[in-house]
């Protein structure tokens, strides 16, 4: 519009997208639970499973079951807990107007992100395993997490990656629900289902047949630890046809011991001695016993099954009953006795055995026993054995003579019965080397007083070279079974040995090493255990290779039938002898797994059945002459002999500090326990890979076709579920027979490395590979075989016979698919009733399908990216290809067309298929493309989609009409048809130019241009939230071929469009079909398409297998967590060593109480990664626990052991070894460094790795500077990386070469990955830099098997889009979170903070670390201020809390702010907004860079923050409680990208682009990636943000702009009470001239100053017409009404006086010049088509009309207003108008049809505020508060297809005043009359005389209205008689205006901003 009468015009343009909260994406997910074979196992175990489901997925009945609490304990069997999580609230997003100049506006296209609203349910399923063992096959879903659930109950749709399973015992406490970023836990639903067990035949035969019937465990090991009291049945596995009976032996576990209070000593009776002997017999003897109701057979668990399968003729089944008596061991109680010397143990009361008598029914067939079951049982309870433990400190020990061993009964774990000796257990050697005579006591200790006391069986009685006894350190408290393996041979001392060397010659017991609790103990014969009932053990391997690791935990347990193969004969107990004689018969001993006395069996190596393992003592050989040297580990026949060490053991001192490691054999500790030998052991093995090097090239072998000539070029990669990969050189490869088939045995060797086989430890590490199998032709169990076969014959028929892993096949960067040629055959994913999947596709499976058939196939966890058109199954299908029952889940990202299944389907059909996941194409291109949830482009008469669905989130950026996006298909043309299908999810399309919709983007056939050949839709539904698109189709035209289309009312379907130079967002009702309520959607989907996804078989790769310590000697059940923690401290040591040190941990230690996640070496406060370089300087160890607490211990290097650095851990007595072997890394670094340093950032090689073309700039990566820095420090980085990566157990050229090869082949990706992490993670927590933790310590959160090298390479390969700086939050989630064992970036940052700064809040840490200048201005209202201090809540104004909120759009700001290299950015945080700007926005010649600029910016930032605070304090005070709560939100404020320099004059005007070198742009605004559209406006709003353009945030005019733009962001939902804008009123109506603050304090407008504080001392005080200080004037809504009401007292009075002067003093023609009339006109709204919104039109008066104006009332009745400031013309709706303070609008013009015009609406709104207040007067008038009332009265309009109530002026008048006034004219007359009635009470006032020339200071005083009327008459006449120029300005040219201003100012000051009225006796 034109500028009238000097009015200062400020233009504002609409830029709001009104997007509210949206429904959550509803997804389907299917799970399975696979059961295993029966087991002879009576222990009860509960499996617990957690999973999530959205609240929207719950039925109303299910919601009623919600329990608002957390689950507590494991209760019944097979239950499910659905734990409910609610998504935190999200901001509504909207597009709002511009504010600024009147110049032509640029078109703005603002994208709005749709927020997902949902509630998650985390489900828990519990399975009790009683009498049966269940094998759980874990379905790998989502990003790879395993879920274990039953196929029923609720489906979980969101965040399935959180699904977790646990194995707990009944009564155990359930885990707490996880904390999930952005979600809040609210309760749970419990559900139960009994899981049946399947019996699985065991058809495998052992490789070596024993001479007697052996015992083989039928138990199929589940993925959880059995309870210690598990009863194991042992049976041989024989061929199916065999019917030979099997003998069954079962070992029952005795009770564990525990400590009790001390009691007095009691004498042992001979009866007790007998009981003790029997007790010891029980510790070894295998009692024959049958589990209750457990049937055992020869080959199957049920003989009848063999008959049914045709394997046997049906025999006669007979049974007989026998009585079996079983001894029950007694418990042992330990009591402390302060009168006994510390370490002394004596028996107070011997235990008595109990017994159990069972009647067993034995079934037989053909006289051969096939099974047994228990008929009845009776039990006699045992009596406990009480042992006293001394606690009195021992000072001196005198030598005692050796007389013999203590125990005359069988030891725990022994195979032979020792000779019975007198009670004296030990011989102490004097300084003369002669044995002293010891009194007849069980164990004697001589105190410093010469008194004898009972001495424990301690090996640590040390005698010095002077013959004087050494001090004995106190024993660590041991709460396990004291009665363990004891020394059998006397200790002898010679003079030749030095001090502190205890020489002892114990019987060398078998090596005590751990047994897997899940496996039975077998004898030393070749037995194949059946751990996997689904397939033979040799097939239980990964898809990449068939490897059977030679460990019992890996299903094979293969041991040579030759007892001397790999091991020597089992060590035998020796008779002790009392001389120094050399033992001629000394033999080596096998290191045999010690079976706890409570579990398992112990066998010899002979093939005979060991029914009675206790052999007579006379059968044993003696070995008394052998002496073990503790310090050297040497075994010598003479005391001075020196030989290589045999065994090593580290035995810490008993005072809690570790000693130097003593390389000893199995020594005996002070409490009589046998010390384990320290060895290396690879635990938790999950996969084994064989590699070889040929001519410098490395390849993996999944099979072998022969024995290699040279095994030196081979090595093994051992993968673990808990620890890093270990590379071991191959020592030998031999051919053997296994199960009748030839296989290759691979033996890998490393120093001290042993492997557990058949409950024994043998040297080295072995496993098996198949002979190269014939190529699979039809049924495939290998993905590589499938790909190879199809590529060779693309027309064949192929079946999946197992789920396949696409990781088997490596594709080059330029390869578009796995199968290159066009496939014309059949691919079927189902075989024998089982459905299989292909997992982990990185590219489309096929390039093209032509006439092919693909059915019953699932593609799981696809992660496909490509430049061109891509689909998961194929890029294109043509010529009648049929795709049926194909289901895909995962992520696809492309730069062109993308389809969940196919990019294009030409004359091809898809039926009963689905896609679930994300599709991303935000690439900006002008090329045509099509994106669809199932198919990008569906074309052709025979092309169809039927009975299918897509659950999809699509991110797109269409900017052309030939770019289409659809929930099911993008483009559907040439008669293609979609029917009986639906889509659900979200489509976020940034721009509005493409064709986008929830079902199909576009139906028109561009090829023919004919309507009849367009695509067709029948019976389809859209449950998709769409930004910039429609619900059903993206384009509507007449004659569309659509029928029965439906959409959800709950969906948010919005378009952002340009209207009248304004960007507006409007809900789309075009192509919505039949709109259904949310409650109808679920049933409609089921009606359209009841598609159920199949349950598919998981990958066959081994799952996680935790180390089991329960069968290790000295295991204590209450220390299970301790052992798990010590395992992390000693990652490569054997289980016996771990148990040993675990038993040293005190109960008050955190290692005892909490789960340890990781251990990090440090040098002071710096993290150490390069262990080799810092081996001896490391001095601290940080222990990080699962609650993210931490503690530090002093660390002291001790020695190297088997290429491991070994450290003492403080004074704990514990050891620590890093999770890395020591090897030569320098040679690797030296070889790869030159090639890495040659790389150039702008090179083609880098671009190829990023996947971009040469024309794409690398700017938005913001990595160029860092790339150079990274190359400078590359040598150190590589050393750290290699130190943190895979362990090289032997320093071998082949394994080193493999690493060299990997680095060279991936050098670009590695360097990009390093550069990325060094750029964005270079910040500190206190003194600790987190960069090294992120790069080199991915195990910090407990995921110990992550490879840092692979992680960096994969990050570098992840592509340009993933490495964009703006995607840093998603990049962490996609590429790093799973590798770190974390969930998301912000939880990771918080967890780091908890570890390193536990007493600092996230926000305080953030502020201390960022170089941005941050101002957080809290409210002056106390209750608000208190809330704003609540960290982590929606109320917090902490910057970190706000930008990490799930509702914040720019969470990617965190890392750029943390890594700012200099102070270049400021941040302002207040109640409702968060502002960001650059210092250089204010840089100029007046404020040059440096202190001047910094001080200016920071001072004004603080002042701006206070203004913004004051503005929302004002609104908080006047709003009701409900609306106040909505003020706590975060609206983005951005200063323009306009930066000055030291020469800039005034404001900077040039826009900086993303490639600007300005530090604020390069380090913050650019990386955040918000491409702000710049224009010539003052500012503009986008619903979720405000962007300052010509105005600047920190200036005063920026404050006024703030009130304008924040009105646009606040009016509908907050200021207007949530009722929304009244239909027809544009957004500018509510800002300028209504709710926005005035531009200047002197503005003569009816407005409210809500933001600026003025002062009486201001230079502008004389002209101020607005409130002085809003923070003081407005304390509540009543104050606001009081102010406006009293102001209108004056306004009405002056308007009345002016009106009287005009009607009484002016002529007709003078009236025509002084007045105008206002009318309404109605124009059809171009957006919604309605014609009920008034446009105000101001017109000149005719002479006839002027003649009618002869009274004041006539001015109201004839709709008159002043001509002084209201020019003739149309006042268009949604304009920038203000109501003039001194130019009367007498009219009360209302809209007879509906909504008022912009002038009348603003004026009446303020009059209602004066009369009724804000909430009861103004809000009802300008909002849709009465919409429902209008609807009930039949006053409706149609808005975008919806019937809406039409609020009319008449309805508002009636409702607001309760019918008091019949017309608005009557109301206004009453308002004037109310003031006229007070004229007699007018207060005297003195004002500046406006008639005096400036600078005259003359004043005038009036005492009554008559005096004022006289002055008004003069002024009116003067204006009427004076000339009216074209540049007329009332401020200068109008006497009336100047008089009114003077009077108004005087009363404003006199009433103290209208705190009182101008009338007496009126407030």
UniProtKB/Swiss-Prot annotation:
Gene Ontology molecular function terms on file: metalloendopeptidase activity; zinc ion binding
Cofactor annotation comment: Binds 1 zinc ion per subunit.
Reactions mediated catalytically: Cleavage of Pro-|-Thr bond in the hinge region of the heavy chain of human IgA
Transmembrane residue ranges: 106-125, 132-154
One GO BP annotation of this record: proteolysis
Segments of skewed composition (Basic and acidic residues): 276-296, 485-511, 574-591
Superkingdom assignment: Bacteria
Coiled-coil features, chain-numbered ranges: none
Binding annotation for Zn(2+): 1604, 1608, 1628
Segments forming domain G5: 314-393
Catalytic machinery residues: 1605
Mode of membrane association: Multi-pass membrane protein; Peptidoglycan-anchor
Stretch list, region Disordered: 253-305, 402-681
Disulfide feature: none
Alphabetical UniProt keywords: Cell wall, Hydrolase, Membrane, Metal-binding, Metalloprotease, Peptidoglycan-anchor, Protease, Repeat, Secreted, Signal, Transmembrane, Transmembrane helix, Zinc
Region (3 X 17 AA approximate tandem repeats): 419-469
Extracellular topological domain residue ranges: 155-1963
Ranges for the Sequence repeats: 419-435, 436-452, 453-469
Renumbered ranges of motif LPXTG sorting signal: 96-100
Major location (coarse): secreted
Subcellular location: Secreted, Cell wall; Membrane
EC code: 3.4.24.13
Function: Zinc metalloproteinase which cleaves human immunoglobulin A1 (IgA1) in the hinge region.
UniProt-listed NCBIfam families: LPXTG_anchor (TIGR01167), YSIRK_signal (TIGR01168)
Name used for this protein in its record: Immunoglobulin A1 protease
Source organism: Streptococcus pneumoniae (strain ATCC BAA-255 / R6)
């Amino acid at each position: 519009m034109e500028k009238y009468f000097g009015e200062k015009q400020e233009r504002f343009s609409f830029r709001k997208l009104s997007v509210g909260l949206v429904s959550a994406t509803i997804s389907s997910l299917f799970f399975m639970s696979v059961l295993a074979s029966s087991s002879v196992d009576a222990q009860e175990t509960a499996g617990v499973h957690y999973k999530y489901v959205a609240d929207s997925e719950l039925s109303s009945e299910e919601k009623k079951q919600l329990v608002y609490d957390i689950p507590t304990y494991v209760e019944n069997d097979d239950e499910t807990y659905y734990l409910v999580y609610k998504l935190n609230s999200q901001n509504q997003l909207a597009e709002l107007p511009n504010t600024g100049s009147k110049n032509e506006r640029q078109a703005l296209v603002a994208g709005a992100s749709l927020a997902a609203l949902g509630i998650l349910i985390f489900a828990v399923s519990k399975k009790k395993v009683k009498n049966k063992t269940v094998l759980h096959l874990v379905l790998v879903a989502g990003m790879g997490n395993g879920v274990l659930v039953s196929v029923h109950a609720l489906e979980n749709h969101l965040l399935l990656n959180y699904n977790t399973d646990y194995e707990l015992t009944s009564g155990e406490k359930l885990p707490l629900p996880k904390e999930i970023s952005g979600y809040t836990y609210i309760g749970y639903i419990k559900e139960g289902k009994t899981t049946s067990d399947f019996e699985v035949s065991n058809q495998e035969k052992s490789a070596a047949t024993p001479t007697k019937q052996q015992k083989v465990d039928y138990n199929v090991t589940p993925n959880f630890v059995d309870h210690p009291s598990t009863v194991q049945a042992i049976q041989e596995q024989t061929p199916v046809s065999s019917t030979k009976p099997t003998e069954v032996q079962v070992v029952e576990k005795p009770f564990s011991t525990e400590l009790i209070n001390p009691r007095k000593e009691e004498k042992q009776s001979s009866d007790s001695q007998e009981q003790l002997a029997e007790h010891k017999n029980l510790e070894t003897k295998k009692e024959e016993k049958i589990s209750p109701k457990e049937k055992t057979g020869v080959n199957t668990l049920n003989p009848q099954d063999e008959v049914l399968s045709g394997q046997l003729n049906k025999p006669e089944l007979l049974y007989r009953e026998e009585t079996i008596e079983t001894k029950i061991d007694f418990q042992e109680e330990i009591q402390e006795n302060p009168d006994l010397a510390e370490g002394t143990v004596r028996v107070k009361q011997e235990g008595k055995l109990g017994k159990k008598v069972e009647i067993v029914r034995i079934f037989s067939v053909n006289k051969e026993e096939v099974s047994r079951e228990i008929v009845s049982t009776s039990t006699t309870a045992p009596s406990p054995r009480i042992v006293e433990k001394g606690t009195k400190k021992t000072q001196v020990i005198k030598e005692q003579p050796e007389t013999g061993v203590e125990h005359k009964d069988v030891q725990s774990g022994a195979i032979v019965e020792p000779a019975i000796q007198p009670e004296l257990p030990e011989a102490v050697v004097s300084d003369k080397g002669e044995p002293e005579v010891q009194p007849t006591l069980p164990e004697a200790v001589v105190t410093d007083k010469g008194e004898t006391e009972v001495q424990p069986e301690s090996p640590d009685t040390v005698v010095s070279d002077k013959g004087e006894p050494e001090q004995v350190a106190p024993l660590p408290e041991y709460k396990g079974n004291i009665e363990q393996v004891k020394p059998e041979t006397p200790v002898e001392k010679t003079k030749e040995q030095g001090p502190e060397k205890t020489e002892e010659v114990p019987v060398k017991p078998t090596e005590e090493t751990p047994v897997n609790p899940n496996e039975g103990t077998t004898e030393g014969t070749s037995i194949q255990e059946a751990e996997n009932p689904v397939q033979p053990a040799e097939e239980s391997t990964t898809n990449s290779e068939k490897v059977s690791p030679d460990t019992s935990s890996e299903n094979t347990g293969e041991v040579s039938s030759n007892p001397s193969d790999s091991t020597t004969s089992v060590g035998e107990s020796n008779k002790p002898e009392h001389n120094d004689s050399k033992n001629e018969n000394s033999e080596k001993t096998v290191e045999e797994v010690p079976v706890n006395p409570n579990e398992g069996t112990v066998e010899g190596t002979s093939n005979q059945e060991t029914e009675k393992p206790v052999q007579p003592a006379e059968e044993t050989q003696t070995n008394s002459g052998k002496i073990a040297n503790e310090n050297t580990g040497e075994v010598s026949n003479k005391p001075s002999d020196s030989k290589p060490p045999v065994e090593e053991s580290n035995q810490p001192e008993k005072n809690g500090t570790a000693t130097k490691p003593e390389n000893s054999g199995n020594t005996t500790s002070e409490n009589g326990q046998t010390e384990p030998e320290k060895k290396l052991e690879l635990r938790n093995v999950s996969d084994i890979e064989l590699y070889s090097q040929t001519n410098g090239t490395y390849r993996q072998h999944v099979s072998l076709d022969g024995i290699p000539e040279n095994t030196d070029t081979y090595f093994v990669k051992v993968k673990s579920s808990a620890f890093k990969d270990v590379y071991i050189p191959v020592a030998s490869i031999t051919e053997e027979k296994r199960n009748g088939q030839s296989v290759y045995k691979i033996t890998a060797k490393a120093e001290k490395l042993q492997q557990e086989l058949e409950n024994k430890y043998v040297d080295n590490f072995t496993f098996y590979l198949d002979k190269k199998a014939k190529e699979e032709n039809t049924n495939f169990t290998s993905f590589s075989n499938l790909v190879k076969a199809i590529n060779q014959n693309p027309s064949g028929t192929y079946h999946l016979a197992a789920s396949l892993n696409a990781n088997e096949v490596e594709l080059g960067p330029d390869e578009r698919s796995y199968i290159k040629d066009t496939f014309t055959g059949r691919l079927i994913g189902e075989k024998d009733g089982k459905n299989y999947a292909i997992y982990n596709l990185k590219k489309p499976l096929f390039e093209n399908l032509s006439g092919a058939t693909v059915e019953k196939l699932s593609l799981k966890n696809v992660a496909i990216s490509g430049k061109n058109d891509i689909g998961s199954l194929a890029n294109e299908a043509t010529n009648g290809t049929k795709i049926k029952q194909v289901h895909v889940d995962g992520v696809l990202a492309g730069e062109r067309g993308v389809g969940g299944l196919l990019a294009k389907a030409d004359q091809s059909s898809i039926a009963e298929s689905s896609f679930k996941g994300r599709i991303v194409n935000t690439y900006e291109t002008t090329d045509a493309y099509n994106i669809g949830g199932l198919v990008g482009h569906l074309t052709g008469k025979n092309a169809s989609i039927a009975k299918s669905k897509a659950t999809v989130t699509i991110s797109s950026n269409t900017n052309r009409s030939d770019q289409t996006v659809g929930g099911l298909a993008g483009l559907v043309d040439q008669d293609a048809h979609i029917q009986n299908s639906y889509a659900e999810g979200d489509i976020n399309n940034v721009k509005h130019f493409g064709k986008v919709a929830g079902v199909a983007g576009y139906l028109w056939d561009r090829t023919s241009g004919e309507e009849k050949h367009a695509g067709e839709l029948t019976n389809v539904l859209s449950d998709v939230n769409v930004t910039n698109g429609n619900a059903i189709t993206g384009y509507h035209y007449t004659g569309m071929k659509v029928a029965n289309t439906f959409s959800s009312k709950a969906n948010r379907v919005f378009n952002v469009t340009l209207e009248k130079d304004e960007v507006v967002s409007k809900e789309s009702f075009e192509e919505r079909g039949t709109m259904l309520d949310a409650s109808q959607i679920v049933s409609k989907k089921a009606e359209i398409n009841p598609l159920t996804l199949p349950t598919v078989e998981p990958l066959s790769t081994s799952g996680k297998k935790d180390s089991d310590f329960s069968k290790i000697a000295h295991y204590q059940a209450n220390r299970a967590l301790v052992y798990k923690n010590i395992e992390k401290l000693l990652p490569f040591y054997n289980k016996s060593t771990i148990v040993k040190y675990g038993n040293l941990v005190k109960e008050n230690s955190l290692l005892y109480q909490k789960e340890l996640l990781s251990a990090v070496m440090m040098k002071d406060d710096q993290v150490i990664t390069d262990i080799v370089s810092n081996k001896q300087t490391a001095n601290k160890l940080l222990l990080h626990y699962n609650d993210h607490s931490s503690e530090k211990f002093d660390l002291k290097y001790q020695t190297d052991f088997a290429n491991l650095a070994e450290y003492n851990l403080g004074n704990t007595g514990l050891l620590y070894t890093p999770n890395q072997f020591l090897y030569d890394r320098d040679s690797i670094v030296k070889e790869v460094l030159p090639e890495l340093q040659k790389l150039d950032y702008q090179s083609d090689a880098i671009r190829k790795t990023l996947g971009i073309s040469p024309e794409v700039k690398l700017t938005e990566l913001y990595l160029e500077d860092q790339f150079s820095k990274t190359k400078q420090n590359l040598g150190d980085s590589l050393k750290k990386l290699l130190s943190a990566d895979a362990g090289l157990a032997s320093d071998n050229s082949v394994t080193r070469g493999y690493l060299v090869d990997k680095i060279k082949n991936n050098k670009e990706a590695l360097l990009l990955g390093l550069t990325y992490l060094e750029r964005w993670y270079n910040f500190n927590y206190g003194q600790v830099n987190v960069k090294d933790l992120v790069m080199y310590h991915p195990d910090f959160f407990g995921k110990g098997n992550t490879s840092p090298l692979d992680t960096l390479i994969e990050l570098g390969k992840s592509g340009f889009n993933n490495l964009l700086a703006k995607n840093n939050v998603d990049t962490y989630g996609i590429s790093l979170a799973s590798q770190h064992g974390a969930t998301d970036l912000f939880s990771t940052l918080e967890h780091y903070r908890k570890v390193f700064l536990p007493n600092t809040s996230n926000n305080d840490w953030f502020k201390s670390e960022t170089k941005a200048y941050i101002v957080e201005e809290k409210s002056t209202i106390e209750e608000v201020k208190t809330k704003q201090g609540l960290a982590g809540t929606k109320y917090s104004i902490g910057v970190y809390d706000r930008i990490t909120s799930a509702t914040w759009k720019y969470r990617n700001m965190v890392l750029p702010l943390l890594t700012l290299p200099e102070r270049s950015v400021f941040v302002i945080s207040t109640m409702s907004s968060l502002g960001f700007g650059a210092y250089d926005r204010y840089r100029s010649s007046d404020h040059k860079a440096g202190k001047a600029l910094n001080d200016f910016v920071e001072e004004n930032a603080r002042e701006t923050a206070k203004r913004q605070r004051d503005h929302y304090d004002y609104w908080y005070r006047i709003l009701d409680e409900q609306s106040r709560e909505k003020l706590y939100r975060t609206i983005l404020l951005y200063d323009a990208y306009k930066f000055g320099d030291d020469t800039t004059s005034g404001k900077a005007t040039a826009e900086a682009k993303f490639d600007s070198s300005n530090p604020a742009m390069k380090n913050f605004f650019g990386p955040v990636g918000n491409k702000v559209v710049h224009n010539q406006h003052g500012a503009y709003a986008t619903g979720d943000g405000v962007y300052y353009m010509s105005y600047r945030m920190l200036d005063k005019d920026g404050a006024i702009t703030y009130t304008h733009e924040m009105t646009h962001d606040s009016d509908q939902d907050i200021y207007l009470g949530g009722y929304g804008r009244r239909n027809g009123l544009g957004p500018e109506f509510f800002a300028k001239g209504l709710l926005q603050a005035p531009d200047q304090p002197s503005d003569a407008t009816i407005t409210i100053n809500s933001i600026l504080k003025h002062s009486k001392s201001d230079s502008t005080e004389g002209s101020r017409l607005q409130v002085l200080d809003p923070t003081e004037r407005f304390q509540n809504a009543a104050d606001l009404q009081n102010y406006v009401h009293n102001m209108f007292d004056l306004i009405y009075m002056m308007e009345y006086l002016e009106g009287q002067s005009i009607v009484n003093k002016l002529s007709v023609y003078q009236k025509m010049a002084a007045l105008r009339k206002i009318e309404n006109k109605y124009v059809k709204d171009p957006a919604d088509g309605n014609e009920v919104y008034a446009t105000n039109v101001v017109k000149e008066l005719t002479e006839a009309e002027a003649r009618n104006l002869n009274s004041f009332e006539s001015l109201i009745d004839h709709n008159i207003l002043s001509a002084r400031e209201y020019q003739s013309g149309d006042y268009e709706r949604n304009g920038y108008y203000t109501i003039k303070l001194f130019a009367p609008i007498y009219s009360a013009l209302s809209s007879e049809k509906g909504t008022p015009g912009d002038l009348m609406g603003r004026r009446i709104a303020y009059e209602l505020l004066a009369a009724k207040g804000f909430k009861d007067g103004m809000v009802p008038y300008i909002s849709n508060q009465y919409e429902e009332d209008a609807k009930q009265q039949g006053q409706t309009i149609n808005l975008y297809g919806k019937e809406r109530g039409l609020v009319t002026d008449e309805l508002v008048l009636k409702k607001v005043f309760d019918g008091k006034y019949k017309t608005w004219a009557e109301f206004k007359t009453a308002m004037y009359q109310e003031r006229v009635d007070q004229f007699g009470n007018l207060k005297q006032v003195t004002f500046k005389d406006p008639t005096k020339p400036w600078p005259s200071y003359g004043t005038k005083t009036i005492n009554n209205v008559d005096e004022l009327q006289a002055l008004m008459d003069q002024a009116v006449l003067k204006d009427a008689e004076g000339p009216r120029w074209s540049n007329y300005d009332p401020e200068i040219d109008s006497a009336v205006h100047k008089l009114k201003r003077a009077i108004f100012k005087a009363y404003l000051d006199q009433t103290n901003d209208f705190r009182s009225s101008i009338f007496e006796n009126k407030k």
